[in-house]
Amino acid sequence: IGRRSAVVVDDGHLVAGLQQRKVLDLFGGTGAISFEFASRGASRVYCVEMAPAHASFIRSQARDFGLDNVTVVHHNVFDFLEICTEKFDLIFADPPYAIDGLAGIPDKIFSHDLLHPGCYFILEHPGDFDFSSHPHFVKERCYGNVHFSFFSADEEA
């Protein structure tokens, strides 16, 4: 797990809240974040990854680590968000910074009602994105050029 992402996972509020929670990890990459959530007590982690080799690797690693609470979804994240009918207690997204559509990810999450009330969506992004005017924006944490924007499902966020 990368140091910057570990800082977010280590946030005391989020770690305590992971016990028996359902988590969605978008743009799974190597699966490190999914494995961290799973090892910290999440009851189910859905890891969405489009690249076949990455999805296969994550699936294999989860099996090797004995993490039967990790489900790998081999799918394009944007298409997945359109068809997903589940609700989650935490959603984390670490998209490639150059990906088209990064700015619209929060709107997709909230327009499809994917979070339980009071739960968080965390988006990792470069500093040239500013989500502070989004109606569900809560706070931003910065580590050098890496930014994490936190959004809440509550209307009063």
Predicted features along the sequence, with ranges:
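Class I S-adenosyl-L-methionine-dependent methyltransferase catalytic core
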Residues: 1-157
